[in-house]
Swiss-Prot record:
HAMAP family, alphabetized: Ribosomal_uS8_B
Keyword vocabulary terms for this entry: Ribonucleoprotein, Ribosomal protein, RNA-binding, rRNA-binding
Subunit architecture: Part of the 30S ribosomal subunit. Contacts proteins S5 and S12.
Function: One of the primary rRNA binding proteins, it binds directly to 16S rRNA central domain where it helps coordinate assembly of the platform of the 30S subunit.
Gene3D superfamilies per record: 3.30.1370.30, 3.30.1490.10
GO biological processes: translation
Keyword Transport: no
Sample GO molecular function, one term: structural constituent of ribosome
Species: Orientia tsutsugamushi (strain Boryong) (Rickettsia tsutsugamushi)
Protein name: Small ribosomal subunit protein uS8
Taxonomic superkingdom: Bacteria
Length: 133
């Protein structure tokens, strides 16, 4: 059985792992997933991630999740916005801060995958992949 939305699968795995208070979660590797995880690390939502080869030519990403000193997860909400069936695009004019600048949109632009803050600085819009708070 093939998976139609691999990014939604990754976000769901992260959400479920944090609800279960796990320290690590594994997801299949792709360059797009790595770029999204780079943004999550830069913005402080996850601690780090490591790519390792499971079998010959098949790579997996091991994500180290981040929690507050009280044990609460840093990610309160992580949801897919643009899906394979319904793409959502925002121009720079319509790109507003998410959750009063406490959360971010992760956007795929012509200059790469980045947070909404970075996209506003560069003056570019694009496809809204997901929102994180």
């Amino acid at each position: 059985m093939s998976m139609s939305d691999t990014l939604a699968d990754m976000l769901t795995r992260i959400r479920n792992a944090q609800r279960s208070r796990l320290m690590y979660v594994n997801v299949p590797s792709s360059r797009r997933r790595e770029a999204i995880l780079d943004v999550l690390v830069k913005e402080g939502f996850i601690h780090s991630f490591l790519i390792h080869e499971v079998r010959n030519g098949i790579k997996e990403i091991n994500i180290k999740l981040k929690y507050s000193p009280k044990g609460e997860s840093n990610i309160k909400e992580i949801n897919r916005v643009s899906t394979p069936g319904k793409r959502v695009y925002l121009s720079i004019k319509k790109l507003r801060p998410y959750y009063n600048n406490m959360g971010i949109y992760i956007i795929s632009t012509s200059k790469g995958i980045m947070s909404d803050r970075e996209a506003r600085k560069l003056g570019v819009g694009g496809e809204v992949i997901c929102k994180v708070f």
